[in-house]
Amino acid sequence: MKTFTAPEGKLVTVLVDGVEVSYVPGQEYPDNAEFVVTSPMTNQPASFDKRGIEPYRAAVMVNEQGVDEANSVKGAIQGGTVTADGMDGVEIHSTSDDFSAVVSVGGKYTIKNSVLNFDTKSDGKHVCDFSGYGSVLAGFQGAQFTVEKTQINSVGVAKPALFCDDRSECLFKDCNVTVRGGKLYDGYVNSANQKTMVAPPWVLGIGGNARGINLEGDRGTAYVVDTCFKANQWGVLSTDAGQNMHLYVADSDMILLGENVPFSDTKDPYSTKYGSGYGSYIIGNAYEEFSGVDIKVGTHGAVLRGGTAVYKSSKGTIKFVSPITGETVYEAPGKGRITRIDCEFGVMAHGDGKIVFTEGTEVNANNAVFLLKSGGVTCDVEDGAKLNSGNGVILQMMDDDDNLVGAKMTDAGPMFNTEFNEMPGWPSENGQITSKMPAPSFDPMAGGPGGPGGPGGPGGPGGPGGPGGPGGPGGPGGPGGPGGMAMAKPDTFLNATDVTLNGNVYNGTGYYGQKPKPLFVTLGKGAVLNGAVSATETRHIDENGNQNTHFTIKEFYHLAHVENRNFFNGDNTVEVTLKDGAVWNVTAPGIINKLTVGEGCTLNGTVTENADGTLTVAPKA
Protein backbone atom coordinates (compact mmCIF):
# COMPACT_ATOMS: atom_id res chain seq x y z
CA MET A 1 0.00 0.00 0.00
CA LYS A 2 1.13 3.57 -0.60
CA THR A 3 0.10 7.20 -0.21
CA PHE A 4 0.71 10.28 -2.33
CA THR A 5 1.07 13.95 -1.51
CA ALA A 6 -0.18 16.39 -4.14
CA PRO A 7 2.36 19.00 -5.23
CA GLU A 8 1.30 22.48 -4.22
CA GLY A 9 -1.16 24.04 -6.65
CA LYS A 10 -1.62 20.81 -8.62
CA LEU A 11 -4.47 18.35 -9.17
CA VAL A 12 -4.16 14.62 -8.62
CA THR A 13 -6.03 11.82 -10.38
CA VAL A 14 -5.75 8.27 -9.06
CA LEU A 15 -6.01 5.23 -11.33
CA VAL A 16 -6.35 1.68 -10.03
CA ASP A 17 -6.36 -0.99 -12.72
CA GLY A 18 -7.34 1.70 -15.21
CA VAL A 19 -10.32 2.88 -13.16
CA GLU A 20 -10.35 6.49 -11.96
CA VAL A 21 -10.96 6.68 -8.19
CA SER A 22 -11.14 9.51 -5.67
CA TYR A 23 -7.95 11.07 -4.41
CA VAL A 24 -7.91 11.61 -0.65
CA PRO A 25 -4.73 13.06 0.90
CA GLY A 26 -3.18 10.57 3.30
CA GLN A 27 -5.30 7.65 2.12
CA GLU A 28 -3.51 4.41 1.33
CA TYR A 29 -3.86 2.96 -2.17
CA PRO A 30 -2.82 -0.38 -3.68
CA ASP A 31 0.76 -0.68 -4.87
CA ASN A 32 -0.37 -0.65 -8.49
CA ALA A 33 -2.17 2.68 -8.11
CA GLU A 34 -1.04 5.43 -10.49
CA PHE A 35 -1.03 9.08 -9.48
CA VAL A 36 -1.34 11.52 -12.37
CA VAL A 37 -0.54 15.17 -11.65
CA THR A 38 -2.11 17.89 -13.77
CA SER A 39 -2.38 21.66 -13.61
CA PRO A 40 -5.63 23.51 -12.97
CA MET A 41 -6.90 25.99 -15.52
CA THR A 42 -5.73 29.56 -15.13
CA ASN A 43 -9.13 30.99 -16.06
CA GLN A 44 -12.66 29.76 -15.49
CA PRO A 45 -13.93 28.70 -18.94
CA ALA A 46 -17.63 28.67 -18.05
CA SER A 47 -19.95 31.64 -18.45
CA PHE A 48 -21.04 30.93 -14.88
CA ASP A 49 -18.01 31.99 -12.87
CA LYS A 50 -19.41 32.76 -9.44
CA ARG A 51 -17.60 29.76 -7.93
CA GLY A 52 -14.19 30.82 -9.21
CA ILE A 53 -11.95 28.49 -11.21
CA GLU A 54 -13.21 24.93 -10.95
CA PRO A 55 -10.59 22.15 -10.62
CA TYR A 56 -11.56 20.38 -13.84
CA ARG A 57 -9.94 17.00 -14.48
CA ALA A 58 -10.58 14.79 -17.50
CA ALA A 59 -9.31 11.83 -19.45
CA VAL A 60 -8.91 14.21 -22.38
CA MET A 61 -8.51 17.97 -22.10
CA VAL A 62 -9.02 19.79 -25.41
CA ASN A 63 -8.44 23.38 -26.43
CA GLU A 64 -8.35 25.32 -29.70
CA GLN A 65 -4.89 23.93 -30.49
CA GLY A 66 -5.98 20.32 -29.96
CA VAL A 67 -5.46 17.86 -27.12
CA ASP A 68 -3.69 19.22 -24.06
CA GLU A 69 -1.50 16.18 -23.47
CA ALA A 70 0.11 17.50 -20.30
CA ASN A 71 -3.20 17.87 -18.52
CA SER A 72 -5.06 14.86 -19.91
CA VAL A 73 -5.34 11.66 -17.87
CA LYS A 74 -5.24 9.19 -20.74
CA GLY A 75 -4.50 6.31 -18.41
CA ALA A 76 -8.23 6.39 -17.61
CA ILE A 77 -8.97 5.31 -21.19
CA GLN A 78 -9.11 1.56 -21.78
CA GLY A 79 -8.96 -0.13 -25.19
CA GLY A 80 -9.85 1.33 -28.56
CA THR A 81 -7.99 4.08 -30.33
CA VAL A 82 -7.33 7.64 -29.24
CA THR A 83 -6.17 10.33 -31.64
CA ALA A 84 -5.91 14.09 -31.66
CA ASP A 85 -9.40 14.23 -33.16
CA GLY A 86 -11.27 11.76 -31.00
CA MET A 87 -11.66 8.32 -29.47
CA ASP A 88 -13.20 5.16 -30.91
CA GLY A 89 -14.10 1.91 -29.18
CA VAL A 90 -12.83 2.96 -25.76
CA GLU A 91 -14.09 2.55 -22.22
CA ILE A 92 -13.72 5.02 -19.38
CA HIS A 93 -14.65 4.00 -15.86
CA SER A 94 -14.76 6.68 -13.16
CA THR A 95 -15.87 6.63 -9.52
CA SER A 96 -14.87 10.04 -8.13
CA ASP A 97 -17.36 12.89 -7.90
CA ASP A 98 -15.80 15.37 -10.28
CA PHE A 99 -13.89 13.62 -13.07
CA SER A 100 -14.92 14.07 -16.72
CA ALA A 101 -14.37 12.08 -19.88
CA VAL A 102 -13.66 15.11 -22.06
CA VAL A 103 -13.44 18.81 -21.23
CA SER A 104 -13.11 21.03 -24.28
CA VAL A 105 -12.45 24.76 -24.33
CA GLY A 106 -12.95 25.79 -27.93
CA GLY A 107 -11.78 22.48 -29.37
CA LYS A 108 -13.38 19.85 -31.58
CA TYR A 109 -13.65 16.21 -30.50
CA THR A 110 -15.47 13.03 -31.59
CA ILE A 111 -16.43 10.00 -29.49
CA LYS A 112 -17.58 6.81 -31.26
CA ASN A 113 -18.50 3.24 -30.28
CA SER A 114 -17.49 3.83 -26.68
CA VAL A 115 -18.68 3.24 -23.12
CA LEU A 116 -18.41 6.05 -20.58
CA ASN A 117 -19.28 4.67 -17.16
CA PHE A 118 -19.27 7.23 -14.34
CA ASP A 119 -20.56 5.30 -11.34
CA THR A 120 -19.95 7.74 -8.48
CA LYS A 121 -21.25 8.51 -5.03
CA SER A 122 -21.48 12.25 -5.70
CA ASP A 123 -23.75 13.86 -3.12
CA GLY A 124 -23.59 17.33 -4.67
CA LYS A 125 -20.88 18.90 -2.53
CA HIS A 126 -18.10 18.76 -5.10
CA VAL A 127 -19.89 19.27 -8.43
CA CYS A 128 -21.79 22.03 -10.21
CA ASP A 129 -23.90 21.53 -13.31
CA PHE A 130 -24.05 25.30 -13.83
CA SER A 131 -20.32 25.29 -14.61
CA GLY A 132 -20.00 21.79 -16.04
CA TYR A 133 -17.80 20.74 -13.13
CA GLY A 134 -18.28 16.99 -12.85
CA SER A 135 -20.19 16.57 -16.13
CA VAL A 136 -19.22 13.56 -18.23
CA LEU A 137 -18.69 15.86 -21.22
CA ALA A 138 -18.17 19.61 -20.82
CA GLY A 139 -17.80 22.09 -23.66
CA PHE A 140 -16.96 25.78 -23.38
CA GLN A 141 -16.25 28.75 -25.66
CA GLY A 142 -17.15 27.27 -29.03
CA ALA A 143 -16.36 23.63 -28.34
CA GLN A 144 -17.76 21.02 -30.75
CA PHE A 145 -18.60 17.45 -29.79
CA THR A 146 -19.86 14.57 -31.92
CA VAL A 147 -20.95 11.48 -29.99
CA GLU A 148 -21.99 8.40 -31.99
CA LYS A 149 -23.02 4.86 -31.01
CA THR A 150 -21.86 5.47 -27.47
CA GLN A 151 -23.26 4.43 -24.11
CA ILE A 152 -23.07 6.90 -21.24
CA ASN A 153 -23.98 5.92 -17.70
CA SER A 154 -23.73 8.53 -14.95
CA VAL A 155 -24.54 7.94 -11.29
CA GLY A 156 -24.34 10.67 -8.67
CA VAL A 157 -25.92 14.00 -7.80
CA ALA A 158 -25.67 16.68 -10.52
CA LYS A 159 -23.60 14.61 -12.94
CA PRO A 160 -25.03 15.44 -16.40
CA ALA A 161 -23.95 13.55 -19.48
CA LEU A 162 -23.35 16.85 -21.25
CA PHE A 163 -22.76 20.47 -20.34
CA CYS A 164 -22.64 22.86 -23.33
CA ASP A 165 -21.82 26.51 -22.75
CA ASP A 166 -21.22 29.67 -24.80
CA ARG A 167 -21.35 28.81 -28.53
CA SER A 168 -20.55 25.17 -27.86
CA GLU A 169 -22.53 22.40 -29.52
CA CYS A 170 -22.85 18.64 -29.36
CA LEU A 171 -24.46 16.10 -31.70
CA PHE A 172 -25.63 12.77 -30.23
CA LYS A 173 -26.36 10.05 -32.83
CA ASP A 174 -27.54 6.52 -32.02
CA CYS A 175 -26.56 6.70 -28.36
CA ASN A 176 -27.94 5.38 -25.09
CA VAL A 177 -27.58 7.81 -22.19
CA THR A 178 -28.68 7.32 -18.58
CA VAL A 179 -28.17 9.83 -15.76
CA ARG A 180 -29.34 8.35 -12.47
CA GLY A 181 -28.63 10.97 -9.83
CA GLY A 182 -27.84 10.03 -6.25
CA LYS A 183 -28.33 10.89 -2.58
CA LEU A 184 -28.06 14.57 -1.58
CA TYR A 185 -25.67 15.49 1.20
CA ASP A 186 -27.14 16.05 4.65
CA GLY A 187 -28.11 19.65 5.27
CA TYR A 188 -28.69 20.58 1.63
CA VAL A 189 -30.86 23.71 1.46
CA ASN A 190 -33.30 23.94 -1.45
CA SER A 191 -32.77 27.26 -3.22
CA ALA A 192 -32.13 28.90 -6.58
CA ASN A 193 -28.56 29.86 -5.64
CA GLN A 194 -26.64 28.55 -8.63
CA LYS A 195 -23.41 28.27 -6.65
CA THR A 196 -24.89 25.50 -4.54
CA MET A 197 -28.01 24.30 -6.36
CA VAL A 198 -27.84 20.61 -7.26
CA ALA A 199 -31.57 19.87 -7.11
CA PRO A 200 -34.58 21.69 -8.58
CA PRO A 201 -36.40 24.39 -6.62
CA TRP A 202 -39.26 22.59 -4.92
CA VAL A 203 -41.63 25.37 -5.97
CA LEU A 204 -41.61 23.83 -9.45
CA GLY A 205 -43.50 20.90 -7.97
CA ILE A 206 -40.75 18.42 -8.81
CA GLY A 207 -37.97 16.49 -7.10
CA GLY A 208 -34.70 14.76 -7.98
CA ASN A 209 -31.09 15.76 -8.68
CA ALA A 210 -30.26 14.56 -12.19
CA ARG A 211 -30.35 16.40 -15.52
CA GLY A 212 -29.21 14.63 -18.67
CA ILE A 213 -28.09 17.73 -20.57
CA ASN A 214 -27.64 21.32 -19.48
CA LEU A 215 -27.22 24.08 -22.08
CA GLU A 216 -26.09 27.52 -20.96
CA GLY A 217 -24.41 30.75 -22.01
CA ASP A 218 -24.71 32.25 -25.48
CA ARG A 219 -26.32 29.69 -27.80
CA GLY A 220 -25.24 26.54 -26.00
CA THR A 221 -26.68 23.94 -28.39
CA ALA A 222 -27.40 20.21 -28.53
CA TYR A 223 -28.71 17.93 -31.27
CA VAL A 224 -30.09 14.50 -30.34
CA VAL A 225 -30.94 11.91 -33.03
CA ASP A 226 -31.89 8.21 -32.73
CA THR A 227 -30.94 8.31 -29.07
CA CYS A 228 -32.53 7.20 -25.81
CA PHE A 229 -31.96 9.82 -23.11
CA LYS A 230 -32.95 8.88 -19.57
CA ALA A 231 -32.64 10.73 -16.29
CA ASN A 232 -33.99 9.66 -12.94
CA GLN A 233 -35.69 12.76 -11.51
CA TRP A 234 -35.46 16.51 -12.21
CA GLY A 235 -35.09 16.87 -15.97
CA VAL A 236 -34.13 14.94 -19.07
CA LEU A 237 -32.84 17.90 -21.12
CA SER A 238 -32.45 21.46 -19.89
CA THR A 239 -31.52 24.96 -20.90
CA ASP A 240 -30.58 27.26 -18.06
CA ALA A 241 -28.47 30.30 -17.21
CA GLY A 242 -27.93 31.89 -20.60
CA GLN A 243 -29.56 33.31 -23.71
CA ASN A 244 -30.67 31.89 -27.06
CA MET A 245 -29.80 28.27 -26.32
CA HIS A 246 -30.95 25.71 -28.91
CA LEU A 247 -32.10 22.12 -28.47
CA TYR A 248 -33.09 19.82 -31.33
CA VAL A 249 -34.32 16.26 -30.76
CA ALA A 250 -35.47 13.83 -33.47
CA ASP A 251 -36.58 10.19 -33.53
CA SER A 252 -35.52 9.75 -29.92
CA ASP A 253 -36.89 8.87 -26.48
CA MET A 254 -36.76 11.08 -23.39
CA ILE A 255 -37.64 9.32 -20.14
CA LEU A 256 -37.61 10.06 -16.41
CA LEU A 257 -37.07 6.76 -14.61
CA GLY A 258 -38.11 7.47 -11.02
CA GLU A 259 -35.98 4.66 -9.58
CA ASN A 260 -34.58 4.40 -6.03
CA VAL A 261 -36.15 7.71 -5.01
CA PRO A 262 -36.11 9.14 -1.46
CA PHE A 263 -38.81 7.73 0.82
CA SER A 264 -40.78 10.99 0.89
CA ASP A 265 -40.95 10.96 -2.92
CA THR A 266 -42.53 7.51 -2.92
CA LYS A 267 -45.67 9.13 -1.52
CA ASP A 268 -46.13 11.19 -4.69
CA PRO A 269 -49.58 10.09 -5.92
CA TYR A 270 -49.10 11.63 -9.36
CA SER A 271 -45.67 10.47 -10.61
CA THR A 272 -46.44 6.77 -10.31
CA LYS A 273 -45.21 5.57 -13.70
CA TYR A 274 -42.29 7.87 -14.43
CA GLY A 275 -39.93 10.02 -12.40
CA SER A 276 -40.84 13.43 -11.03
CA GLY A 277 -39.59 16.28 -13.20
CA TYR A 278 -39.73 17.62 -16.74
CA GLY A 279 -38.85 16.55 -20.25
CA SER A 280 -37.19 19.86 -21.09
CA TYR A 281 -36.73 23.32 -19.61
CA ILE A 282 -37.13 26.42 -21.78
CA ILE A 283 -35.56 29.67 -20.55
CA GLY A 284 -33.58 32.66 -21.79
CA ASN A 285 -35.26 32.92 -25.21
CA ALA A 286 -34.32 29.31 -25.92
CA TYR A 287 -35.55 27.52 -29.03
CA GLU A 288 -36.40 23.83 -28.70
CA GLU A 289 -37.68 21.51 -31.42
CA PHE A 290 -38.90 17.95 -31.00
CA SER A 291 -39.53 15.83 -34.11
CA GLY A 292 -40.86 12.32 -33.58
CA VAL A 293 -39.92 12.16 -29.90
CA ASP A 294 -41.45 10.06 -27.12
CA ILE A 295 -41.37 12.07 -23.88
CA LYS A 296 -42.32 10.08 -20.78
CA VAL A 297 -42.16 12.01 -17.52
CA GLY A 298 -43.92 12.09 -14.19
CA THR A 299 -44.73 15.81 -14.01
CA HIS A 300 -44.22 18.36 -16.80
CA GLY A 301 -43.67 17.53 -20.45
CA ALA A 302 -41.86 20.86 -20.48
CA VAL A 303 -41.41 23.90 -18.26
CA LEU A 304 -41.59 27.26 -20.03
CA ARG A 305 -39.74 30.21 -18.52
CA GLY A 306 -38.94 32.15 -21.69
CA GLY A 307 -38.60 30.90 -25.25
CA THR A 308 -40.23 28.74 -27.90
CA ALA A 309 -40.80 25.00 -28.21
CA VAL A 310 -42.20 23.19 -31.25
CA TYR A 311 -43.45 19.61 -31.13
CA LYS A 312 -43.93 17.93 -34.51
CA SER A 313 -43.43 14.73 -36.47
CA SER A 314 -40.24 13.42 -38.05
CA LYS A 315 -41.76 13.01 -41.49
CA GLY A 316 -39.65 14.17 -44.40
CA THR A 317 -36.08 15.35 -43.97
CA ILE A 318 -34.63 16.17 -40.58
CA LYS A 319 -32.17 19.02 -40.94
CA PHE A 320 -30.34 20.78 -38.14
CA VAL A 321 -28.57 24.05 -38.88
CA SER A 322 -26.14 25.43 -36.33
CA PRO A 323 -27.29 28.72 -34.78
CA ILE A 324 -23.62 29.43 -34.21
CA THR A 325 -21.95 28.76 -37.58
CA GLY A 326 -24.94 28.59 -39.93
CA GLU A 327 -23.66 25.25 -41.22
CA THR A 328 -25.76 22.10 -41.58
CA VAL A 329 -24.93 19.83 -38.66
CA TYR A 330 -27.22 16.93 -39.57
CA GLU A 331 -29.45 16.08 -42.53
CA ALA A 332 -31.18 12.75 -43.15
CA PRO A 333 -34.65 11.29 -43.72
CA GLY A 334 -36.77 11.13 -40.58
CA LYS A 335 -38.59 8.00 -39.43
CA GLY A 336 -42.05 9.53 -39.72
CA ARG A 337 -42.80 9.27 -36.00
CA ILE A 338 -45.16 11.62 -34.22
CA THR A 339 -44.16 13.30 -30.99
CA ARG A 340 -45.95 11.82 -27.99
CA ILE A 341 -45.87 13.22 -24.46
CA ASP A 342 -47.03 11.22 -21.42
CA CYS A 343 -47.11 13.39 -18.30
CA GLU A 344 -49.10 14.92 -15.43
CA PHE A 345 -49.15 18.38 -17.05
CA GLY A 346 -48.31 18.91 -20.72
CA VAL A 347 -46.49 22.22 -20.38
CA MET A 348 -46.13 24.29 -17.22
CA ALA A 349 -45.40 27.96 -17.88
CA HIS A 350 -44.06 30.33 -15.24
CA GLY A 351 -42.66 32.74 -17.80
CA ASP A 352 -43.63 33.94 -21.25
CA GLY A 353 -43.07 32.24 -24.57
CA LYS A 354 -44.67 30.09 -27.24
CA ILE A 355 -45.64 26.43 -27.47
CA VAL A 356 -46.61 24.76 -30.76
CA PHE A 357 -48.19 21.31 -31.00
CA THR A 358 -48.45 20.29 -34.65
CA GLU A 359 -48.26 17.42 -37.18
CA GLY A 360 -50.23 14.95 -35.09
CA THR A 361 -48.39 15.52 -31.82
CA GLU A 362 -50.17 13.65 -29.03
CA VAL A 363 -50.23 14.82 -25.42
CA ASN A 364 -51.56 12.44 -22.77
CA ALA A 365 -51.79 14.46 -19.57
CA ASN A 366 -53.41 13.29 -16.35
CA ASN A 367 -54.16 16.93 -15.59
CA ALA A 368 -54.17 20.13 -17.67
CA VAL A 369 -52.37 20.06 -21.02
CA PHE A 370 -51.42 23.74 -20.72
CA LEU A 371 -50.76 24.81 -17.12
CA LEU A 372 -50.11 28.54 -17.26
CA LYS A 373 -48.93 30.31 -14.11
CA SER A 374 -47.76 33.32 -16.10
CA GLY A 375 -49.10 35.61 -18.78
CA GLY A 376 -47.50 36.27 -22.14
CA VAL A 377 -47.88 32.70 -23.37
CA THR A 378 -49.07 31.71 -26.85
CA CYS A 379 -50.35 28.16 -27.29
CA ASP A 380 -50.77 27.04 -30.91
CA VAL A 381 -52.50 23.70 -31.53
CA GLU A 382 -52.72 22.69 -35.17
CA ASP A 383 -52.55 20.09 -37.91
CA GLY A 384 -54.17 17.12 -36.19
CA ALA A 385 -52.55 17.44 -32.77
CA LYS A 386 -54.34 15.41 -30.10
CA LEU A 387 -54.62 16.78 -26.57
CA ASN A 388 -55.92 14.24 -24.06
CA SER A 389 -56.54 15.47 -20.51
CA GLY A 390 -57.39 13.10 -17.69
CA ASN A 391 -59.28 15.78 -15.76
CA GLY A 392 -60.85 17.32 -18.84
CA VAL A 393 -58.84 20.56 -18.81
CA ILE A 394 -57.08 21.66 -21.97
CA LEU A 395 -55.82 24.99 -20.62
CA GLN A 396 -55.59 26.07 -16.99
CA MET A 397 -54.55 29.61 -16.12
CA MET A 398 -53.84 30.05 -12.42
CA ASP A 399 -51.90 32.30 -10.08
CA ASP A 400 -48.30 31.29 -9.60
CA ASP A 401 -48.13 29.14 -6.49
CA ASP A 402 -44.31 29.28 -6.62
CA ASN A 403 -44.72 32.88 -5.50
CA LEU A 404 -47.31 31.97 -2.91
CA VAL A 405 -44.72 29.79 -1.19
CA GLY A 406 -42.41 32.80 -1.04
CA ALA A 407 -38.76 33.04 -0.09
CA LYS A 408 -36.43 34.58 2.48
CA MET A 409 -33.56 36.75 1.34
CA THR A 410 -30.19 35.64 2.69
CA ASP A 411 -26.59 36.58 1.98
CA ALA A 412 -26.48 33.60 -0.40
CA GLY A 413 -29.62 34.68 -2.24
CA PRO A 414 -33.27 33.71 -1.88
CA MET A 415 -34.06 30.61 0.13
CA PHE A 416 -37.52 29.21 -0.45
CA ASN A 417 -39.95 28.91 2.38
CA THR A 418 -40.69 25.28 3.11
CA GLU A 419 -44.47 25.38 3.50
CA PHE A 420 -47.49 26.24 1.37
CA ASN A 421 -50.58 27.68 3.03
CA GLU A 422 -53.97 28.56 1.60
CA MET A 423 -57.03 29.91 3.37
CA PRO A 424 -60.00 27.53 3.50
CA GLY A 425 -62.78 28.11 1.00
CA TRP A 426 -62.88 29.92 -2.32
CA PRO A 427 -61.00 33.21 -2.93
CA SER A 428 -64.25 35.09 -3.52
CA GLU A 429 -65.41 34.04 -0.06
CA ASN A 430 -62.26 34.61 2.00
CA GLY A 431 -61.04 37.98 0.76
CA GLN A 432 -58.46 36.75 -1.73
CA ILE A 433 -59.52 38.62 -4.86
CA THR A 434 -56.43 40.66 -5.70
CA SER A 435 -58.26 43.84 -6.75
CA LYS A 436 -60.04 43.92 -3.38
CA MET A 437 -57.01 43.16 -1.23
CA PRO A 438 -55.01 45.88 0.59
CA ALA A 439 -51.44 46.50 -0.46
CA PRO A 440 -48.91 44.48 1.55
CA SER A 441 -47.67 46.16 4.71
CA PHE A 442 -44.84 43.72 5.33
CA ASP A 443 -42.09 41.96 3.45
CA PRO A 444 -44.01 40.22 0.65
CA MET A 445 -41.34 37.55 0.36
CA ALA A 446 -41.90 36.34 3.87
CA GLY A 447 -45.60 35.51 3.72
CA GLY A 448 -48.35 37.18 5.68
CA PRO A 449 -49.88 36.30 9.02
CA GLY A 450 -51.94 33.20 8.55
CA GLY A 451 -49.76 32.05 5.65
CA PRO A 452 -49.70 33.02 2.02
CA GLY A 453 -52.88 34.59 0.92
CA GLY A 454 -53.40 36.63 4.07
CA PRO A 455 -53.66 40.38 3.69
CA GLY A 456 -50.81 41.29 1.41
CA GLY A 457 -49.87 37.66 0.83
CA PRO A 458 -46.80 36.76 -1.16
CA GLY A 459 -46.95 37.59 -4.78
CA GLY A 460 -48.61 40.97 -4.25
CA PRO A 461 -47.30 44.04 -6.03
CA GLY A 462 -43.55 43.91 -5.65
CA GLY A 463 -43.73 40.35 -4.33
CA PRO A 464 -41.80 37.38 -5.64
CA GLY A 465 -42.11 36.98 -9.34
CA GLY A 466 -42.57 40.69 -9.96
CA PRO A 467 -40.14 42.61 -12.12
CA GLY A 468 -36.72 41.17 -11.34
CA GLY A 469 -38.29 38.24 -9.42
CA PRO A 470 -37.28 37.47 -5.87
CA GLY A 471 -33.65 37.80 -5.19
CA GLY A 472 -32.56 39.16 -8.54
CA PRO A 473 -29.85 36.96 -10.02
CA GLY A 474 -30.76 33.35 -9.46
CA GLY A 475 -34.30 34.22 -8.42
CA PRO A 476 -36.71 31.40 -7.84
CA GLY A 477 -37.87 31.20 -11.39
CA GLY A 478 -36.93 27.79 -12.61
CA PRO A 479 -33.89 25.70 -12.05
CA GLY A 480 -31.26 28.33 -11.58
CA GLY A 481 -32.65 30.78 -14.08
CA PRO A 482 -30.27 33.54 -15.10
CA GLY A 483 -31.45 36.01 -12.53
CA GLY A 484 -34.73 37.82 -12.08
CA MET A 485 -36.73 38.28 -15.23
CA ALA A 486 -38.88 41.11 -16.45
CA MET A 487 -42.60 40.80 -15.87
CA ALA A 488 -44.15 38.74 -18.64
CA LYS A 489 -46.72 40.40 -20.86
CA PRO A 490 -50.12 39.54 -19.41
CA ASP A 491 -52.02 38.51 -22.54
CA THR A 492 -52.34 34.78 -23.13
CA PHE A 493 -53.49 33.14 -26.36
CA LEU A 494 -54.89 29.75 -27.30
CA ASN A 495 -55.06 29.33 -31.08
CA ALA A 496 -56.48 26.19 -32.70
CA THR A 497 -56.65 25.18 -36.38
CA ASP A 498 -57.32 21.80 -37.99
CA VAL A 499 -57.79 20.07 -34.63
CA THR A 500 -60.55 18.76 -32.39
CA LEU A 501 -60.14 19.79 -28.76
CA ASN A 502 -62.04 17.85 -26.10
CA GLY A 503 -61.87 19.65 -22.78
CA ASN A 504 -62.29 22.90 -20.93
CA VAL A 505 -60.42 26.20 -20.92
CA TYR A 506 -60.18 28.21 -17.70
CA ASN A 507 -58.80 31.59 -16.65
CA GLY A 508 -58.40 31.38 -12.89
CA THR A 509 -56.03 34.34 -12.36
CA GLY A 510 -56.28 37.47 -10.22
CA TYR A 511 -56.33 36.03 -6.72
CA TYR A 512 -54.01 35.70 -3.71
CA GLY A 513 -52.42 39.10 -4.35
CA GLN A 514 -51.34 38.26 -7.90
CA LYS A 515 -52.18 40.12 -11.07
CA PRO A 516 -54.92 38.84 -13.40
CA LYS A 517 -54.09 37.95 -17.00
CA PRO A 518 -56.43 38.21 -20.01
CA LEU A 519 -57.12 35.12 -22.11
CA PHE A 520 -57.88 35.13 -25.84
CA VAL A 521 -59.19 31.93 -27.43
CA THR A 522 -59.30 31.74 -31.23
CA LEU A 523 -60.79 28.77 -33.06
CA GLY A 524 -59.81 28.88 -36.72
CA LYS A 525 -60.17 26.80 -39.86
CA GLY A 526 -60.90 23.15 -39.18
CA ALA A 527 -61.05 23.67 -35.40
CA VAL A 528 -63.70 22.03 -33.21
CA LEU A 529 -63.93 22.63 -29.45
CA ASN A 530 -66.04 20.26 -27.39
CA GLY A 531 -65.89 21.90 -23.99
CA ALA A 532 -66.47 24.92 -21.79
CA VAL A 533 -64.58 28.21 -21.64
CA SER A 534 -64.80 30.31 -18.50
CA ALA A 535 -63.36 32.78 -16.06
CA THR A 536 -62.92 30.92 -12.78
CA GLU A 537 -61.56 31.00 -9.27
CA THR A 538 -59.20 28.27 -8.10
CA ARG A 539 -58.10 26.52 -4.96
CA HIS A 540 -55.63 23.71 -4.37
CA ILE A 541 -56.81 20.14 -3.97
CA ASP A 542 -55.18 16.85 -3.03
CA GLU A 543 -55.34 13.60 -4.94
CA ASN A 544 -58.77 12.89 -3.44
CA GLY A 545 -60.28 16.18 -4.58
CA ASN A 546 -60.32 17.80 -1.13
CA GLN A 547 -59.06 21.34 -0.62
CA ASN A 548 -55.37 21.29 0.26
CA THR A 549 -54.73 24.24 2.57
CA HIS A 550 -51.29 23.21 3.80
CA PHE A 551 -48.37 21.09 2.67
CA THR A 552 -44.59 21.16 3.03
CA ILE A 553 -41.50 20.89 0.87
CA LYS A 554 -41.65 17.11 1.28
CA GLU A 555 -45.01 17.19 -0.50
CA PHE A 556 -43.81 19.34 -3.39
CA TYR A 557 -45.94 17.33 -5.80
CA HIS A 558 -49.18 18.99 -4.61
CA LEU A 559 -48.23 22.32 -6.21
CA ALA A 560 -50.33 23.27 -9.28
CA HIS A 561 -53.13 20.82 -8.55
CA VAL A 562 -56.25 22.98 -8.40
CA GLU A 563 -59.99 22.88 -8.97
CA ASN A 564 -62.13 25.56 -10.61
CA ARG A 565 -65.43 27.28 -9.99
CA ASN A 566 -66.93 29.66 -12.53
CA PHE A 567 -66.37 33.21 -11.29
CA PHE A 568 -65.50 36.57 -12.83
CA ASN A 569 -63.47 38.70 -10.43
CA GLY A 570 -63.67 41.80 -12.60
CA ASP A 571 -60.28 41.30 -14.22
CA ASN A 572 -59.76 37.69 -15.39
CA THR A 573 -61.22 38.42 -18.80
CA VAL A 574 -61.85 35.83 -21.50
CA GLU A 575 -62.54 36.56 -25.17
CA VAL A 576 -63.52 33.83 -27.64
CA THR A 577 -63.38 34.18 -31.43
CA LEU A 578 -64.65 31.68 -33.99
CA LYS A 579 -63.53 32.20 -37.58
CA ASP A 580 -63.07 30.36 -40.87
CA GLY A 581 -65.81 27.82 -40.20
CA ALA A 582 -64.80 26.84 -36.66
CA VAL A 583 -67.20 24.93 -34.40
CA TRP A 584 -67.75 25.25 -30.64
CA ASN A 585 -69.90 22.60 -29.03
CA VAL A 586 -70.52 23.96 -25.54
CA THR A 587 -70.60 21.17 -22.94
CA ALA A 588 -70.94 23.14 -19.69
CA PRO A 589 -71.77 26.72 -18.65
CA GLY A 590 -68.98 29.29 -18.66
CA ILE A 591 -68.49 33.01 -18.08
CA ILE A 592 -66.71 35.02 -20.78
CA ASN A 593 -66.44 38.70 -21.68
CA LYS A 594 -66.65 38.73 -25.45
CA LEU A 595 -67.78 36.30 -28.13
CA THR A 596 -67.26 36.73 -31.86
CA VAL A 597 -68.81 34.15 -34.17
CA GLY A 598 -67.61 34.64 -37.73
CA GLU A 599 -69.42 33.87 -40.94
CA GLY A 600 -69.78 30.15 -41.57
CA CYS A 601 -68.94 29.26 -37.96
CA THR A 602 -71.10 27.21 -35.60
CA LEU A 603 -71.86 27.82 -31.94
CA ASN A 604 -73.83 24.96 -30.45
CA GLY A 605 -74.79 26.70 -27.25
CA THR A 606 -76.80 29.55 -25.76
CA VAL A 607 -75.55 33.01 -24.83
CA THR A 608 -77.01 35.08 -22.00
CA GLU A 609 -75.87 38.58 -21.08
CA ASN A 610 -75.39 39.11 -17.36
CA ALA A 611 -75.95 42.26 -15.30
CA ASP A 612 -72.19 42.90 -15.01
CA GLY A 613 -71.77 42.79 -18.79
CA THR A 614 -70.30 39.30 -18.90
CA LEU A 615 -71.76 36.53 -21.01
CA THR A 616 -72.81 33.09 -19.86
CA VAL A 617 -72.32 30.54 -22.61
CA ALA A 618 -74.12 27.29 -21.87
CA PRO A 619 -75.11 24.09 -23.68
CA LYS A 620 -78.36 24.08 -25.58
CA ALA A 621 -81.24 22.66 -23.57
Regions found by a protein language model. Give the residues of each.
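Residues in short coils/turns that link rungs of repeat/solenoid architectures in beta-rich domains
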Residues: 94, 118, 154-156, 179, ...
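Post-signal peptide N-terminal segment of secreted/secretory-pathway proteins
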Residues: 89-179
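Extracellular beta-solenoid/beta-roll
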Residues: 389, 491-492, 501-503, 510, ...
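Low-complexity, glycine- and small/polar-enriched segments
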Residues: 70-74, 96, 147, 182, ...
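Extended alpha-helical scaffolding regions
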Residues: 230-250
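Acidic/polar low-complexity surface segments
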Residues: 41-69, 117-141, 166, 177-218, ...
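All-beta strand scaffolds that present successive hydrophobic residues in beta-strands
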Residues: 6, 15-16, 23, 29-31, ...
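Short terminal (N- or C-terminal) low-complexity/amphipathic segments
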Residues: 2, 9, 21-27, 32-33, ...
